[in-house]
Amino acid sequence: KLAKDNGEIGTLEMIIITSRDPEPPGIEYLKAAGGFFRDTTIHDFDLSRFILGDDPIVEVSAYGSQLISEECKEVGDHDTAMFIMRSQKGVLIHINNSRRAVYGYDQRVEIFGSKGMMISNNQSPSSVEKFDKEKTYSKDLIHFFFIERYAQAYKDQLDAFVNIVMNNEKPSVSFEDGRNALILANAAYDSLNNGQSMKVVY
C-alpha cells in the first residue's frame, strides 16, 4: 500500500486478490460462520478498502457455486466464489475465493497501475529452487494454513495492540473499517441472490 500511495505504480487501475483455503471447515463451523462471504471474503473486502484508501467501493457483482463441499451444500453455503467490484474513481477489483486448494493456503495480491505492477505472492518455508539440464525442480509447498502464513503478522498485531493500550493511543483500524467490510459482504449477497450488480450504500 505504501508503494501505491507513493506513486510507484502510477495511477491505480486494478486490484486482483486470490484467497483460497487448503480445505473446507467442518459442518459445525459452517453453521456458525455467517456464510462464505462474511467468513472468508470479508477479509478481502477489507484489504481492498485498505489498498484503495479514500476511494470507496461503490458497486459489487458476486457469483457463487457449490463445487467442493457436501457440508457447504448441507448448510446452503457456497465454497467457490468470484467478485467484480468498482471504486468511485473507476478502479476495478477482482476477488476469487475457494474453500479448497490442495497445494496449501493460497494468498496472492496484485495491484496494477499506469506505471507498473506489484505482486505479493505465496510464501513457502524455503525459497530454495533447483535447476539443471533435465528440469526445473519445484520448490517447497506453500504454507498450509493461516497460522503459519501470518505468524509474523499476528505477532506484529499483538505488539501494536499492547503499544496502543500502554500509550493510550488511537488504533489505526476503526469500527467503521469493520462495518464497511460487512456492508460490502452484505451487498455481495444481495448481488448473488438478485443476479445483478449492486450499488453499495454505506
What are the language-model segments listed below?
Residues M14-I17, A153-A160:
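Generic alpha-helical secondary structure signal
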